[in-house]
Amino acid sequence: MTPLLRFLNRTSLVTQIVIGLLAGIALALLAPAIACDLAFLGKVFVSALKAVAPVLVFILVMASIANHRHGQETHIRPILWLYLLGTFAAAVVAVVASMLFPSHLVLSTGEATLSAPGGITEVMQNLVLSAVDNPVNALLNANFIGILTWAIGLGVALRHAGETTRTVVDDLSNGVTLIVRMVIRFAPLGIFGLVSSTLAQSGLNALLGYLHLLAVLIGCMLFVALVMNPLIVFWKIRRNPYPLTLLCLRESGITAFFTRSSAANIPVNLALSERLGLHEDTYSVSIPLGATINMAGAAITITVLTLAAVHTLGIPVDLPTAVLLSVVAAVCACGASGVAGGSLLLIPLACSLFGIPSEIAMQVVAVGFIIGVLQDSAETALNSSTDVLFTAAACLAEERRNP
């Protein structure tokens, strides 16, 4: 065995990712031209994750439900409530932070050509339409709502199939999981390419003009990740939540930060859930579900940028409106994965609460894209790490009640 292979076998994946991260930063600073060329490594890694994630979710959920035995508990309902509670709590934190540290934007005059949903009804309609999408189309376009719908439907139908059929489905699940593990082993190389090319191309100059807004956004996300989420987990498991919280941030949050895709991070979260010894019938459904509806980071982004526009325009905000904004942001965030452009394109919907015209709201969206290098990364890291955190908390709480 070569020294390189021995090193790779002895070193944990997280350590390899940190080495790739530091090497990427160093290369971007020392040789930006070479770093730009290495963007290919990052693109290949993210493309591989995005390619395998829809198939993984479809097969894994279908196999989990098809092979489910009567009497087994899956604990999905408490996890779903944790997802909704966490998203609403994040929106409340963002409202409070925006009131304490109001941000002011220099809104650009350029017209945006993006299209945003016209109301909460339209967001919910999009979710329903996504759920009844053609299964082949859902797999091709990574429509995870549609994939989950078909996987659950087929899984329920196959529960009445013969033992041989269920065994084949289970073997398919094991095969796809093996491929995913192979893809994840290339995470250090992928993150090396992503970090080096992003820093070399964008630099940090584009972010300097929006430091205050970024500080509020990132501060809210850190507060939710390190204070609010641990409080929710403590309420659930009744013991020190920080070992579990920090483990999820380290193992899931770091990769999500650089891939900037909750869907691409699903395989990472499933692998972490397996290592934690969680209930497979539970996490195989709750992790993909969390990637579509557990959007604490998106709730923060929508709330902070909307209130930044409100403060810039001098619009007064009373307490009932602030509470309503929290609810709207939480509902919008749950639908963010079903909207092209994610959380940023749902900002005009929240702005409509304050009578802000769409032209100005879309300028706020443009500001969001400018700071997206950090905002989108931090948002995805919070969203994705919370998926596995709340899943683990619910499973551990159930084990505590039924040892």
Swiss-Prot record:
Q: Where is this chain's protein located in or outside the cell?
A: Cell inner membrane
Q: Name one GO cellular component term.
A: plasma membrane
Record Pfam families: SDF
Coiled-coil annotation reads none
Which regions span the lipid bilayer? Answer: 14-34, 45-65, 79-99, 138-158, 175-195, 214-234, 295-315, 327-347, 353-373
Q: How does it sit in the membrane?
A: Multi-pass membrane protein
InterPro entries hit by this protein: Na-dicarboxylate_symporter, Na:dicarbo_symporter_sf, Ser_Thr_transp_SstT
Gene Ontology biological process: serine transport; threonine transport
GO MF, one example: neutral L-amino acid:sodium symporter activity
Record's catalysed reaction(s): L-serine(in) + Na(+)(in) = L-serine(out) + Na(+)(out); L-threonine(in) + Na(+)(in) = L-threonine(out) + Na(+)(out)
Q: List UniProt keywords, sorted A-Z.
A: Amino-acid transport, Cell inner membrane, Cell membrane, Membrane, Symport, Transmembrane, Transmembrane helix, Transport
Q: What is its main location?
A: membrane
Question: What family does this chain come from, according to its entry?
Answer: Belongs to the dicarboxylate/amino acid:cation symporter (DAACS) (TC 2.A.23) family.
Which function does this protein serve?
A: Involved in the import of serine and threonine into the cell, with the concomitant import of sodium (symport system).
What's the protein here called?
A: Serine/threonine transporter SstT
Q: Which organism is it from?
A: Pseudomonas putida (strain GB-1)
